[in-house]
Structures are given as structure tokens and as C-alpha cells.
Amino acid sequence: MSENAHSTWLHRFAVFAVCCTFILIGMGGLVTSREAGLTVPDWPTSFGYNMFLLPLDQWLGKFGIFEEHAHRLMASLVGLFTAGIAIWMWARESVAHTRTIAITGVLITLGLMGVRTQTMFVVMAVAASLMAAFSVIKIISNRSALRWWATLAYSMVIVQGVLGGLRVTQLKDQIGVLHGTLAQIFLIVLTCIALFSSRWWKESKAAKTVASLAPRVVRSHFFYATLLIFLQLILGATMRHQHAGLPVWDFPRAHGQWWPSTEESMLAKYNADRSALQNQLHANKQTLDPSGNPTIFLTTGKDIQASHISLHMFHRVTALLILGLVLGTAILTHRKLGGGHMLSTLSLLWLGLVLVQATLGILTVLKYKPADIATLHVLFGAATLLTGAMGTVISRSRDLPACFEAVEEESDDTTQMEAAS
């Protein structure tokens, strides 16, 4: 079947997989927010059981264990959906031996996942990494070949699952940061599949020349703002996976200063202040829910270090830069393309997401890092990155003329200039 043929059900299934991935990222964020990542200490088994056969009474309703095990199960489901998309794409876009080999390869990897040993999963992750790299090369040569996008997504989900498991067994924060970052990239790839398989994408006009694209200034703003958001999410993931609690708990200042000192004497004071605040909150019954489970994570037992404060402050500064850049993108897009243009609407949505995201970040600080708000902060961060990425893709590939209002205003300006001359 042609690469350009449209399948409504394939598109719907891809959208469903994107929604499940978004939920999965939220579940992963909750695991980290509640410091629950090591409540199930083994992998790929769970308390010695096959992960899918863990008795319900060992994880349902148990704080921390429920979040971690549910995250593992949801990740497996997303992996299965991604495998389904890969099989579907290869069945549609290839023929004869190529189709058979590709589908057989996916089915073999699914079968090998039944061998629940860490060595097997690591070997599969290495092979999947090579296949992901090969898929990228094929995508560069033919961006419309969705079978290779699907292969990339399936390869990534295998690597992502193994990284999540190794984070448990190797106890390395760096793996956690990589795991969180790759999740965002995987979400973008999967959403690209959903976008490229949509009827709108098939029927909209592809840009033949640079002149038929959105103005360069609009494309650049979408791209660089998205890149900055991606770097911001890496900063955020690094902060979360330090498992150091909240190094600063006031806003807009930080420890009463615009840029807090990180001298040893001041660090000692910050730690003493945080301990006193934690004790006060505990005395006021603000740290635990009625079941005795923690609700805020002001401290995790680790002392505040200079690197924790520096990272926190850089995160604040980058947030301001993102807000300014996305605001500029919205203004420029409206001026260049008109208020009714698709990219103008998308830029307004993007700005709204950034404002909500900034508000959630502030509340995370002022409310002493409650798990629910911190998790929402992760989710809106993913949505913000995804919106920027889709704006970047659309602005650099579709021929979407400016709205009539924008063209008319530009013509009026030209007429006035000619009359004045």
C-alpha cells in the first residue's frame, strides 16, 4: 500500500498510544515525586515474581509499591501498543519478504521479552539502539516512510524500558535522568506518527520551496524555544533525580536573596532552616495524610549542597527565558500569519501551557514540593515540549498561507508607503 494512503483507524490507534504515553509519563513523574522508585527493589522481576504475575495483595493499596508496579505495567502496555503500530505500518507500507522479515523481527523481540533476565534485556537494548540509529538514517532519506518512524518508536521503547529497570538495579541517578529525557523524545516521535498518519497531514499541502514555508523568524522562534524547553526539562529531570528534596522554598527570592550565597556557612544555615521548617510542618500535621503517608517532600534526608541551589536557580532563569521566547513567538506568529492561522492558534495554546507550567513550578516551591503538584509540573512540561515540537514540524514542512487579514494588512501598509512616496 502507498505510504501516502490514509487509514483512520491507524491514526486513531496512534493517538490512543500517545495518550497512554502521556499517562505513563505522569505515572513516572508520580513515582519520582513520591520517592517510590526503589520500593520494588528488583528487575525485571518484582519481589521475585514474574512482573505480570505479582499477587494483587502485594501491591494494590500499598504506598510507593503501587505507584512503581503500576508504572511498570503501564510501560509494558505502551510497549505492546508501539509494537502493534510497528507491525501495522510494515504491513501497510511493505510487501513480500521485507514485510515478513520486519513483522517477524517485532514478534521475535516480543517473545524474547518473556525471558525475564537482566542480561537478555540489556542485549535487546543494545540491538534496539542500533536499530534506532538505522531508523533515523532511513527517516532522513525518506521522511514520509512511517514504517521507519514506527521502528524508531519501537526501538526507543525497548531502550526506555531497560533504562527504567537499570535505574532500579544500578542505583545511578544519571540513568534516571536519561530515562526521563528519553521518555520526552519517545513522546515526540510517537506524536509525529499520529500527526503524519492524520487525514489533515495527508490532505494539507507540503511546502515545495522555502518561500512557501512559514516566515523564517516564526520557524526559528518555534525551534529555539522548543530546544530551550528541552534543555529545561533535562535540568528539571536532573533536579528530581538528585532526590535531595527542595533546596529553596521561597519565591520570587531564594533564601531571601535574588541569588543565594553558596558559602559553607550559608549552606549550614539553609539546612538548619529546612530542618526547623520540616519539624514545624510535621507538628502542624502538614506532612502526612490520614494514612500516615508523606504528602510533601521538602527534605529527603540529604543535606542541601551548592550544586542543588545552583541548579534550582538556573532552572528559574531558564523558565523566564522560555516565557519571553514563547511570548515572542506568539506575537510574531500573529503579526506575520494573522490571528486565524493554525500556527497562531498553536502559539497561543503554547503560551497558555507555559504560563500554567510556570505557575505549577512556583506552587511546587511555595507548597514545599507536594507530590501531586510536582507531578502536574512534569506533565505540563511534557505538553509544553510536545506543543513546541509539533509547531516546529508543521512550520518547517507545510505550505499554510497567511490568513487573509494578515495579507490585507500588509497590502494596506504597502499602499500607504507607496502613496507617501
What is each model feature region?
Residues 1-9, 95-98, 102-108, 140, ...:
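Membrane-interfacial, low-structure loops and terminal tails that flank and connect transmembrane helices
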Residues 92-101, 135-151, 330-350:
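Membrane-interface helix-loop-helix junctions at transmembrane boundaries of multi-pass membrane enzymes
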